[in-house]
């Protein structure tokens, strides 16, 4: 047998098992994206950032401090029409907080996947500074051929807040799966633990907050992200700058920047957020914009 024939035989032998393998289930990249534009500026650290509607995407217990209402949105559109958008709202009903939100990701035309979509609804019970939350999540992935794979899953979250000084949080995501269409999605179970600490009194004119978050996910190594933001506020108006650094989730295809920057303009109960990612699934040098209103 010639060397050329040997290579051909080896190729057919190797190809046999591969062709018999099942088609890999789609992985929803959107689940690896930051929960908000603020979190995007902190390299994705958002599990221990309580009091905003977008928290339901990574830790349902995070909406517990909301006293009346919180509405939040964010987006980014690149020249080739690749798009990322999110919106969420949360409110308090007696001893409970409820929230609902959605995220959408449209990929560049060079990627086989057309888009990702996720909806989530959360309920949180709070007693004192301790909050326990649960969320139901719908996720879908569509490819360029128009095939859509859909699944349902759930999240759990626990948060302990120490007034406005600090918060400790733990979140379990993608716990269980119910297939809606197709063979279901690849939803790696994920555990995150986070800590945030206000280094300055939040009732003063200064702002300085540190957050640290570690995440363990199936088929992925442990990741730790550190974020810092600081600024000044006078009579409800102010400016905050932020930066974060740390490894990004494997579910996002290792395409998110490990280091990010961002900032916010504070306008009383409202704020305008900005974040910059040098590298993202939707392209390079991505600018994200968002807004938040908490009356």
Locate the predicted segments by residue:
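Membrane-embedded beta-strand positions in outer-membrane beta-barrel channels/transporters
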Residues: 39, 57, 86, 120-122, ...
């Amino acid at each position: 047998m010639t060397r050329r024939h040997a290579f051909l035989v080896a190729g057919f032998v190797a190809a046999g098992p591969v062709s018999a393998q099942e088609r890999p289930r789609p992985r929803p990249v959107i689940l690896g994206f930051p929960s908000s534009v603020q979190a995007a500026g902190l390299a994705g650290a958002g599990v221990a950032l309580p009091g905003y509607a977008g928290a339901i995407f990574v830790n349902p217990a995070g909406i517990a401090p909301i006293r009346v209402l919180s509405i939040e949105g964010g987006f980014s559109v690149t020249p080739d029409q690749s798009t990322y958008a999110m919106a969420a709202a949360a409110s308090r009903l007696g001893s409970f907080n409820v929230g609902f939100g959605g995220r959408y990701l449209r990929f560049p035309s060079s990627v086989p996947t057309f888009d990702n979509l996720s909806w989530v609804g959360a309920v949180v019970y709070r007693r004192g500074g301790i909050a326990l939350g649960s969320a139901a999540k719908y996720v879908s992935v569509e490819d360029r051929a128009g095939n859509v794979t859909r699944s349902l899953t759930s999240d759990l979250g626990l948060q302990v807040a120490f007034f406005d000084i600090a918060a400790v949080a733990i979140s379990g995501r993608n716990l269980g799966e119910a297939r809606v269409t197709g063979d279901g999605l690849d939803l790696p179970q994920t555990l995150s633990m986070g800590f945030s600490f206000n280094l300055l009194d939040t009732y003063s004119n200064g702002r300085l907050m540190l957050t640290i978050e570690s995440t363990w996910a199936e088929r992925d190594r442990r990741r730790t992200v550190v974020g810092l933001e600081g600024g000044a506020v006078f009579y409800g108006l102010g400016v905050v700058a932020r930066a974060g650094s740390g490894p990004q989730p494997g579910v996002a295809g290792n395409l998110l920047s490990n280091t990010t920057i961002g900032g916010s303009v504070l306008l009383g109960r409202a704020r305008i957020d900005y974040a910059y990612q040098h590298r993202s699934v939707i392209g390079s040098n991505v600018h994200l914009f968002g807004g938040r209103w908490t009356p």
